[in-house]
Amino acid sequence: MSGAQPKAVEMSGAAAVIAEVDASRIETRHRQGWVGHVTDSLPQAFALAKEAMDSHTPISIAYHGNVVDLLEYAVKEQIHIDLLSDQTSCHAAYDGGYCPVGLTFEERTRMLHENPAEFRRKVDATLKRHFLAIKELVGRGTYFFDYGNSFMKAVYDAGVPEIARNGSDKNGFIFPSYVED
């Protein structure tokens, strides 16, 4: 978890829930004052965000858990997300930069070393779910952009050609990357 995301959110007057699987990163950012709130409860994370938005109070919330769980929860609970990005280390998805859903950070680390083929299979399955959740949210009005972390390329490599224009990663992807306003 970067400290830049939650700090930028609060500076801009917004509300954000930022997922992170590594508790030590959350603890560091919270101790440094870069993120305001910490929870491992999705209902609590979104309730805090809604309360802050309703009162026009900036808030940054670190959710200790997997981003796919967070996004699938938002889909299931019909929670609108205005702006969505992803900062997982997808440039190194199979080297530990991406945590498969259903695994703790520690389980991810162990599986990466003990069973890399199974780790890769789980990463691919999770990337597919990640894409489907984003696609559903975008269909409901969420604006998603790639943070320049190779997320869309990783999804394509995981076996999802529909993330690419014309089904080929040579023609670009369906979501924008590195957005400026």
Which residues make up each language-model segment?
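Catalytic or ion-translocation cores adjacent to nucleophile or general acid/base/metal-coordination motifs
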Residues: 2-54, 85-132, 166, 170-181
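Structured helix-beta-strand junction loops
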Residues: 55, 80, 140-141
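Polyanion-binding loop/helix "lid" in catalytic or ligand-binding cores
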Residues: 61-63, 125-129, 136
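Conserved divalent-metal-coordinating catalytic cores
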Residues: 49-51, 58-63
